[in-house]
UniProtKB/Swiss-Prot annotation:
The gene is MADPRT. The keyword NAD applies. PROSITE patterns: ART, TR_MART. It comes from the Eukaryota. Residues 276-300 are annotated as: Disordered. Keywords: Disulfide bond, Glycosyltransferase, NAD, NADP, Nucleotidyltransferase, Signal, Transferase. Residues 1-22 form the signal peptide. GO terms for molecular function: NAD+ poly-ADP-ribosyltransferase activity; NAD+-protein-arginine ADP-ribosyltransferase activity; nucleotidyltransferase activity. This is Erythroblast NAD(P)(+)--arginine ADP-ribosyltransferase.
Length: 300
Protein backbone atom coordinates (compact mmCIF):
# COMPACT_ATOMS: atom_id res chain seq x y z
CA UNK A 1 0.00 0.00 0.00
CA UNK A 2 1.40 3.40 -0.95
CA UNK A 3 2.45 5.57 1.97
CA UNK A 4 0.12 8.56 1.25
CA UNK A 5 -2.89 6.24 1.05
CA UNK A 6 -1.86 4.52 4.27
CA UNK A 7 -1.57 7.89 6.02
CA UNK A 8 -5.02 8.88 4.77
CA UNK A 9 -6.57 5.66 6.09
CA UNK A 10 -4.83 6.01 9.44
CA UNK A 11 -6.03 9.61 9.66
CA UNK A 12 -9.64 8.57 9.12
CA UNK A 13 -9.32 5.80 11.72
CA UNK A 14 -7.92 8.32 14.21
CA UNK A 15 -10.77 10.73 13.50
CA UNK A 16 -13.43 8.09 14.03
CA UNK A 17 -11.79 6.85 17.22
CA UNK A 18 -12.12 10.31 18.80
CA UNK A 19 -15.86 9.85 18.97
CA UNK A 20 -16.01 6.39 20.48
CA UNK A 21 -18.39 7.31 23.28
CA UNK A 22 -20.78 9.27 21.09
CA UNK A 23 -20.80 6.72 18.30
CA UNK A 24 -21.45 3.91 20.74
CA UNK A 25 -24.46 5.74 22.10
CA UNK A 26 -25.73 6.49 18.62
CA UNK A 27 -25.21 2.94 17.34
CA UNK A 28 -27.41 1.19 19.88
CA UNK A 29 -29.91 -0.95 18.04
CA UNK A 30 -33.53 -0.03 18.40
CA UNK A 31 -36.63 0.68 16.37
CA UNK A 32 -36.11 3.01 13.43
CA UNK A 33 -37.99 6.29 13.79
CA UNK A 34 -39.90 7.37 10.67
CA UNK A 35 -39.98 11.12 9.92
CA UNK A 36 -41.52 12.89 6.94
CA UNK A 37 -39.54 16.00 5.98
CA UNK A 38 -41.47 19.25 5.65
CA UNK A 39 -40.91 22.93 6.41
CA UNK A 40 -40.47 22.17 10.14
CA UNK A 41 -43.33 24.56 10.99
CA UNK A 42 -42.70 24.45 14.75
CA UNK A 43 -39.02 25.35 14.47
CA UNK A 44 -37.76 28.54 16.09
CA UNK A 45 -36.11 30.13 13.07
CA UNK A 46 -35.37 33.74 14.08
CA UNK A 47 -32.69 35.47 11.98
CA UNK A 48 -32.66 38.62 14.20
CA UNK A 49 -32.89 40.95 11.21
CA UNK A 50 -32.74 44.58 12.25
CA UNK A 51 -32.30 43.97 15.99
CA UNK A 52 -28.73 42.71 16.42
CA UNK A 53 -27.59 45.56 18.69
CA UNK A 54 -30.75 45.43 20.79
CA UNK A 55 -30.43 41.67 21.23
CA UNK A 56 -26.77 41.94 22.20
CA UNK A 57 -27.70 44.49 24.86
CA UNK A 58 -29.90 41.83 26.47
CA UNK A 59 -27.34 39.01 26.41
CA UNK A 60 -25.69 39.51 29.78
CA UNK A 61 -28.91 39.32 31.75
CA UNK A 62 -30.38 36.63 29.51
CA UNK A 63 -27.29 34.47 29.74
CA UNK A 64 -27.27 34.72 33.53
CA UNK A 65 -30.88 33.53 33.62
CA UNK A 66 -30.24 30.64 31.25
CA UNK A 67 -27.32 29.34 33.29
CA UNK A 68 -30.00 27.86 35.53
CA UNK A 69 -30.22 25.20 32.82
CA UNK A 70 -27.47 22.79 33.84
CA UNK A 71 -27.06 21.35 30.33
CA UNK A 72 -26.37 24.79 28.92
CA UNK A 73 -24.25 25.92 31.87
CA UNK A 74 -21.97 22.88 31.77
CA UNK A 75 -21.59 22.99 27.99
CA UNK A 76 -20.75 26.69 28.08
CA UNK A 77 -18.20 26.23 30.88
CA UNK A 78 -16.43 23.44 28.99
CA UNK A 79 -16.39 25.44 25.76
CA UNK A 80 -15.00 28.51 27.54
CA UNK A 81 -12.14 26.42 28.92
CA UNK A 82 -11.45 25.05 25.44
CA UNK A 83 -11.46 28.56 23.98
CA UNK A 84 -8.95 29.71 26.60
CA UNK A 85 -6.74 26.71 25.86
CA UNK A 86 -6.73 27.37 22.10
CA UNK A 87 -6.82 31.13 21.73
CA UNK A 88 -6.59 32.75 25.15
CA UNK A 89 -2.96 33.81 24.69
CA UNK A 90 -3.08 34.78 21.02
CA UNK A 91 -3.63 38.34 19.86
CA UNK A 92 -4.14 37.93 16.10
CA UNK A 93 -7.25 39.42 14.46
CA UNK A 94 -10.38 37.34 14.78
CA UNK A 95 -13.23 36.42 12.49
CA UNK A 96 -15.68 35.76 15.32
CA UNK A 97 -16.11 37.46 18.66
CA UNK A 98 -15.19 35.38 21.67
CA UNK A 99 -18.78 34.61 22.69
CA UNK A 100 -19.69 33.51 19.15
CA UNK A 101 -16.65 31.23 18.94
CA UNK A 102 -17.50 29.72 22.33
CA UNK A 103 -21.05 29.07 21.12
CA UNK A 104 -19.72 27.08 18.15
CA UNK A 105 -17.34 25.14 20.40
CA UNK A 106 -20.16 24.38 22.83
CA UNK A 107 -22.34 23.05 20.02
CA UNK A 108 -19.62 20.72 18.70
CA UNK A 109 -18.45 19.29 22.03
CA UNK A 110 -19.32 15.85 23.36
CA UNK A 111 -22.22 15.76 25.79
CA UNK A 112 -25.92 16.37 25.73
CA UNK A 113 -26.02 20.06 24.83
CA UNK A 114 -26.25 19.85 21.03
CA UNK A 115 -28.88 17.10 21.18
CA UNK A 116 -31.08 18.80 23.79
CA UNK A 117 -30.64 22.17 22.07
CA UNK A 118 -31.62 20.82 18.65
CA UNK A 119 -34.68 19.01 19.97
CA UNK A 120 -35.81 22.17 21.75
CA UNK A 121 -35.23 24.33 18.66
CA UNK A 122 -37.40 22.04 16.52
CA UNK A 123 -40.43 22.74 18.74
CA UNK A 124 -39.73 26.15 20.30
CA UNK A 125 -41.60 27.89 17.49
CA UNK A 126 -44.91 26.15 18.11
CA UNK A 127 -45.96 29.54 19.46
CA UNK A 128 -44.34 32.84 20.34
CA UNK A 129 -45.29 32.36 23.97
CA UNK A 130 -43.71 28.92 24.07
CA UNK A 131 -40.42 30.39 22.86
CA UNK A 132 -40.55 33.23 25.38
CA UNK A 133 -41.48 31.13 28.40
CA UNK A 134 -40.11 27.63 27.74
CA UNK A 135 -37.08 27.80 25.45
CA UNK A 136 -33.91 27.87 27.59
CA UNK A 137 -31.42 28.36 24.76
CA UNK A 138 -32.14 31.90 23.53
CA UNK A 139 -28.52 32.97 24.05
CA UNK A 140 -27.04 29.97 22.26
CA UNK A 141 -29.50 30.27 19.36
CA UNK A 142 -28.66 33.95 18.87
CA UNK A 143 -24.88 33.52 19.11
CA UNK A 144 -24.82 30.52 16.77
CA UNK A 145 -27.00 32.36 14.27
CA UNK A 146 -24.69 35.38 14.34
CA UNK A 147 -21.58 33.19 14.11
CA UNK A 148 -22.85 31.45 10.98
CA UNK A 149 -23.90 34.77 9.45
CA UNK A 150 -20.47 36.28 10.06
CA UNK A 151 -18.64 33.26 8.67
CA UNK A 152 -20.95 33.09 5.66
CA UNK A 153 -20.21 36.72 4.80
CA UNK A 154 -16.46 36.21 5.06
CA UNK A 155 -16.05 33.05 2.98
CA UNK A 156 -15.09 33.04 -0.69
CA UNK A 157 -17.19 30.04 -1.72
CA UNK A 158 -20.93 30.84 -1.62
CA UNK A 159 -22.23 27.26 -1.55
CA UNK A 160 -20.95 23.85 -0.44
CA UNK A 161 -21.77 20.27 -1.38
CA UNK A 162 -21.96 18.31 1.86
CA UNK A 163 -23.15 15.00 3.26
CA UNK A 164 -25.10 14.00 6.35
CA UNK A 165 -25.56 10.49 7.68
CA UNK A 166 -28.27 9.62 10.21
CA UNK A 167 -28.59 6.50 12.34
CA UNK A 168 -31.87 5.50 13.96
CA UNK A 169 -34.16 7.77 11.93
CA UNK A 170 -35.48 7.12 8.44
CA UNK A 171 -36.44 10.39 6.79
CA UNK A 172 -38.68 10.48 3.75
CA UNK A 173 -39.24 13.43 1.43
CA UNK A 174 -41.34 13.96 -1.66
CA UNK A 175 -39.31 14.90 -4.72
CA UNK A 176 -39.96 18.47 -5.82
CA UNK A 177 -41.12 19.74 -2.43
CA UNK A 178 -39.37 22.42 -0.37
CA UNK A 179 -38.22 21.42 3.12
CA UNK A 180 -36.13 22.62 6.06
CA UNK A 181 -34.16 20.79 8.73
CA UNK A 182 -35.53 23.29 11.28
CA UNK A 183 -32.52 23.00 13.58
CA UNK A 184 -28.80 23.65 13.44
CA UNK A 185 -27.73 20.69 11.34
CA UNK A 186 -24.28 19.14 11.16
CA UNK A 187 -22.92 17.88 7.87
CA UNK A 188 -19.49 17.07 6.46
CA UNK A 189 -17.51 17.89 3.35
CA UNK A 190 -16.29 14.27 3.48
CA UNK A 191 -18.68 11.53 2.44
CA UNK A 192 -16.84 8.87 4.45
CA UNK A 193 -17.18 10.89 7.65
CA UNK A 194 -20.92 11.32 7.10
CA UNK A 195 -21.34 7.59 6.42
CA UNK A 196 -19.73 6.82 9.77
CA UNK A 197 -22.53 8.64 11.60
CA UNK A 198 -25.25 6.56 9.98
CA UNK A 199 -26.80 5.14 6.84
CA UNK A 200 -30.46 4.76 7.80
CA UNK A 201 -30.84 8.10 6.03
CA UNK A 202 -28.12 9.62 3.91
CA UNK A 203 -28.32 13.21 2.68
CA UNK A 204 -26.43 14.84 -0.16
CA UNK A 205 -26.93 18.58 0.27
CA UNK A 206 -26.06 21.76 -1.56
CA UNK A 207 -26.11 24.44 1.15
CA UNK A 208 -25.60 28.16 0.57
CA UNK A 209 -26.07 29.28 4.20
CA UNK A 210 -24.23 26.46 5.94
CA UNK A 211 -20.58 27.29 6.63
CA UNK A 212 -17.42 25.28 7.39
CA UNK A 213 -16.58 25.38 11.09
CA UNK A 214 -13.52 23.11 11.01
CA UNK A 215 -11.29 25.74 12.60
CA UNK A 216 -13.77 26.24 15.43
CA UNK A 217 -14.91 22.67 15.99
CA UNK A 218 -13.92 20.38 18.84
CA UNK A 219 -13.39 17.75 16.12
CA UNK A 220 -11.72 19.52 13.17
CA UNK A 221 -11.11 16.24 11.35
CA UNK A 222 -14.83 15.92 10.69
CA UNK A 223 -14.72 18.83 8.21
CA UNK A 224 -18.07 19.97 9.57
CA UNK A 225 -20.38 22.39 7.80
CA UNK A 226 -23.14 23.72 10.06
CA UNK A 227 -26.49 24.50 8.42
CA UNK A 228 -28.87 27.03 10.07
CA UNK A 229 -32.54 26.20 10.83
CA UNK A 230 -33.97 28.71 8.38
CA UNK A 231 -32.33 27.48 5.16
CA UNK A 232 -34.83 25.84 2.82
CA UNK A 233 -34.12 23.18 0.21
CA UNK A 234 -35.71 21.68 -2.86
CA UNK A 235 -35.85 17.87 -2.78
CA UNK A 236 -34.20 16.92 -6.07
CA UNK A 237 -34.05 13.17 -5.44
CA UNK A 238 -35.51 10.81 -2.85
CA UNK A 239 -35.10 7.04 -2.98
CA UNK A 240 -35.59 4.13 -0.61
CA UNK A 241 -33.52 0.99 -1.06
CA UNK A 242 -32.82 -1.95 1.25
CA UNK A 243 -34.26 -0.17 4.27
CA UNK A 244 -32.26 3.00 3.70
CA UNK A 245 -33.31 6.45 2.52
CA UNK A 246 -31.23 8.63 0.22
CA UNK A 247 -32.29 12.28 -0.07
CA UNK A 248 -30.70 14.92 -2.27
CA UNK A 249 -31.33 18.59 -1.45
CA UNK A 250 -30.55 21.85 -3.22
CA UNK A 251 -30.60 25.22 -1.45
CA UNK A 252 -33.60 27.44 -2.18
CA UNK A 253 -32.72 30.44 -0.03
CA UNK A 254 -34.05 31.00 3.46
CA UNK A 255 -37.40 31.33 5.16
CA UNK A 256 -38.36 32.38 8.69
CA UNK A 257 -41.60 32.74 10.61
CA UNK A 258 -40.10 34.65 13.54
CA UNK A 259 -37.98 37.78 13.79
CA UNK A 260 -36.60 39.58 16.87
CA UNK A 261 -39.14 37.95 19.18
CA UNK A 262 -37.20 38.37 22.43
CA UNK A 263 -36.50 42.05 21.76
CA UNK A 264 -40.14 42.66 20.84
CA UNK A 265 -41.19 41.25 24.20
CA UNK A 266 -38.62 43.25 26.17
CA UNK A 267 -38.71 46.60 24.38
CA UNK A 268 -41.73 46.91 22.13
CA UNK A 269 -44.72 46.63 24.46
CA UNK A 270 -45.32 50.35 24.71
CA UNK A 271 -44.97 51.05 21.00
CA UNK A 272 -44.38 48.77 18.00
CA UNK A 273 -40.81 48.27 16.84
CA UNK A 274 -39.97 48.32 13.14
CA UNK A 275 -37.56 45.56 12.16
CA UNK A 276 -36.61 44.41 8.68
CA UNK A 277 -38.21 40.98 8.91
CA UNK A 278 -37.32 39.47 5.55
CA UNK A 279 -39.42 36.33 5.81
CA UNK A 280 -38.06 34.74 2.65
CA UNK A 281 -34.98 35.65 0.70
CA UNK A 282 -33.26 34.33 -2.41
CA UNK A 283 -29.82 32.79 -2.53
CA UNK A 284 -26.97 35.03 -1.34
CA UNK A 285 -24.92 37.14 -3.67
CA UNK A 286 -21.18 36.50 -3.87
CA UNK A 287 -19.83 36.80 -0.31
CA UNK A 288 -16.97 38.99 0.77
CA UNK A 289 -13.50 37.73 -0.26
CA UNK A 290 -10.70 36.88 2.09
CA UNK A 291 -12.12 34.31 4.46
CA UNK A 292 -9.59 33.43 7.15
CA UNK A 293 -9.79 30.83 9.93
CA UNK A 294 -10.38 32.02 13.46
CA UNK A 295 -7.14 33.04 15.05
CA UNK A 296 -7.57 34.66 18.40
CA UNK A 297 -9.88 37.23 19.84
CA UNK A 298 -8.55 40.31 21.51
CA UNK A 299 -8.97 40.24 25.25
CA UNK A 300 -12.23 41.76 26.47
Amino acid sequence: MEEPLLHAILGLVLLLSTRTDASAARSKKGPIKEVVMDMAPHSFDDQYQGCIDLMEAELQELNRTEFANETFAEGWRSATEEWQRRWGRVSSPMVLRQDQAIAVLAYTMEGELYRVFNNATLTAGRSRQHYLSSYPFKTLHFLLSRALHTLQESQTQPCHNVFRGVRGTRFTAQQGTVVRFGQFTSSSLQKKVAEFFGLDTFFSVETCYGVPIKDLSTFPGEDEVLIPPFEQFRVTNSTYTAGRSFIQLRSQGKSSTYNCEFVKEKRCKERPCAFSADKSSPLPRSPWPGWAPLAAPHSH
